[in-house]
From Swiss-Prot:
Recorded GO CC terms: large ribosomal subunit
Protein name: Large ribosomal subunit protein uL15
GO MF annotations, alphabetized: rRNA binding; structural constituent of ribosome
Biased amino acid composition, Gly residues: 21-31
An annotated GO BP: translation
Positions of the UniProt region annotated as Disordered: 1-63
Function: Binds to the 23S rRNA.
InterPro entries, A to Z: Ribosomal_uL15, Ribosomal_uL15/eL18, Ribosomal_uL15/eL18_sf, Ribosomal_uL15_bac-type, Ribosomal_uL15_CS
Quaternary structure and interacting proteins, as annotated: Part of the 50S ribosomal subunit.
Family listed: Belongs to the universal ribosomal protein uL15 family.
Superkingdom of source: Bacteria
Record keywords: Ribonucleoprotein, Ribosomal protein, RNA-binding, rRNA-binding
PROSITE patterns (UniProt xref): RIBOSOMAL_L15 (PS00475)
Length: 147
């Protein structure tokens, strides 16, 4: 047996349906669309969610709240992640984005107190939790809250 004798398994290569090519093709005449009606017309069919005039599910269910366009998502970062920086380094929002710890598109960053930090760092940031601040200062570092 060589490469020229290889064939795909029976039934694995299905022919595509060529509609409107005469009755001999098996898909002629009405082109698999049935007789008349909205779905038989060109561009026919109904939009997503349309239920034939019945009140659609999306309108029957109650709505609650909304997502404010003014508020931006706050990206959180735990103290344990700051161990990746060297001792004595000054960390600000720009450096966090530069290092890849936070996406560059992040508008607000808050440092939280999960985990431990084992060396002193200087952190300049707008938002930081009390626990995170205490842990950084306990490790010999300092926190400068920027306004």
């Amino acid at each position: 047996m060589d490469l020229s004798q290889l064939r795909p398994p029976e039934g694995s290569r299905k022919k595509r349906k060529r509609i409107g090519r005469g009755s001999g093709s098996g898909h002629g005449g009405t082109s698999c669309k049935g007789h008349k009606g909205q779905n038989a017309r060109s561009g026919g069919g109904v939009r997503d969610g349309f239920e034939g005039g019945q009140m659609p599910l999306s309108r029957r269910l109650p709505k609650r709240g909304f997502r404010s366009r003014i508020l931006k998502d706050i990206v959180t970062l735990n103290v344990e992640k700051l161990n990746g920086f060297q001792t004595g380094v000054e960390i600000d929002e720009h450096r966090l984005k530069e290092s890849g710890m936070v996406k560059s598109s992040a508008e607000k960053i808050k440092i939280l107190g999960k985990g431990e930090i084992d060396h002193p760092l200087t952190v300049k940031i707008k938002m930081i939790s009390q626990g995170a601040k205490a842990k950084i200062e306990a490790a010999g570092g300092s926190v400068i809250e920027v306004v």
